[in-house]
Amino acid sequence: VRKIIGLTIIVLLLTSIMMGCKSGTKVDSTDTQVDTAATQAACADTQTDTEDGSSYSTDTQSDTEDTSANSADTQTDTKDTSVNSADTQTDKEEPDTDMRDITTMQLVYDMGIGINLGNTFDSTGDWINSSEVRNFETAWGSPVITENMIKAYAEAGFRTMRIPVTWSNMLSSDYVIDTAWMDRIQQIVDWVIGNGMYAIVNLHHDSFIGELFPTNEAEGFKKYEAIWSQVSERFKDYSDYLIFESMNEPGFDAIWNQYTGTQKQKERAFDLINRINQRFVDLVRASGGNNAERHLLISAYYTNIGHANNGLTKMPDDPAGRCAISVHYYTPWTWVALEHDETWGKARWEWGTPEDYAELNSELDLMKTNYVDKGIPVIIGEYCMCSKKPKEYSDLWEIEVTRGIYERGMCPVYWDVQGSATNFFDRKTLTWGNPEVLAAMQEISATRDFTNRDDN
């Protein structure tokens, strides 16, 4: 009996010691997370200003394949800790897999005002060295993206980030996406969701959509399905904070010329877009995991409001009933983009007449009447000034377009690129070049109640 009692005491003592060690490890881990904030701040300048300061590496990318920064436990901590080191990235937990019981209309309402990570992963060109991801990422003027940049967007009040991706940039001849490219996109998605924003991932400047489909439809579908099959598989367990968008500004000039084409050609072009969108929904829904219920974004023909309302655009049949439509707003083009007169139009230097407001309201009312009021949510996936115009009028246009979209229950997603006409956000310095427009956006956003965002 004495021996048994003695052994029992020893076991209890050893258990107590082991419990203490585990507890100590947790405390040390927490301290490490807090201390990395200083490291993150010290490295930020190097990461944004030099190629060697990239926030990702081959080793890091392979380690992040099965990890995510968007779990409920890590969302609050990631704001104060760096994910720019290999140690931090490999310690990430599995992605949050929560799919809330909310409609797509409720989700779009909760998406608030969004912003694009433009001219970054959508950059493309034959002159770009395709040996490394960063060559595409920085080709059109963006620095290498860091989590500090994503965090700055979130802290400014943006609730959604659209991540345009040209998957064809790093795609094999048999349509396999390069692992490093996929890993990098996943890392960006993790940062976006980890900082409390919705992430929209699409096919952007994949020119085969406009070029291959009209000449070889079967091969076009094969390539399109191959890309979305891989993307769907990689992200199938992500929560409903990730949205897939079928395409970007798709159209078929080889089938139908918008200005000289026939009605029959027009119907053929729209039918093809409708069939591609249907195949997109069918493929994602059949891919397993949370994709069976994922909220999806359907691109209208050229994402044009007029085309979306001409009676030929058809929303896909979706067993989950979770689709929204995407259009863009760059109207009037002579004001938004033209800096010199052309044969087809004269550059405008002012905006804000009663006729201008009537045009804005008319186009947005089309989307509200024909979509929102009929239960189909609307996301204006892009809008911004594309030319340097007098600030007084340029600011007015951007503010009024944001307000008009928002007040109609739709989600405005601003097109932000580096060196843009309005110099909206500088990713290198993390500063806002147009605080007046930003403040107006924040004021507009505040008109919605997001206090119970998980249930609204």
Where are these regions (language model features)?
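An active-site-proximal structural segment forming one wall of the substrate-binding cleft
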Residues: 140-160, 171, 175-205, 212-246, ...
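Active-site region of glycoside hydrolase catalytic domains
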Residues: 221-354, 365-386, 407-410
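N-terminal carbohydrate-binding accessory modules
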Residues: 89-160
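C-terminal motif of bacterial Sec signal peptides marking the signal peptidase cleavage site
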Residues: 17-20
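Bacterial signal peptide processing site
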Residues: 22-24
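Acidic/histidine-rich helix-loop elements
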Residues: 118-145, 173-177, 215-216, 334-359, ...
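Substrate-binding cleft of secreted/luminal carbohydrate-active enzymes
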Residues: 357-432
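Long, intrinsically disordered low-complexity tandem-repeat segments
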Residues: 29-92
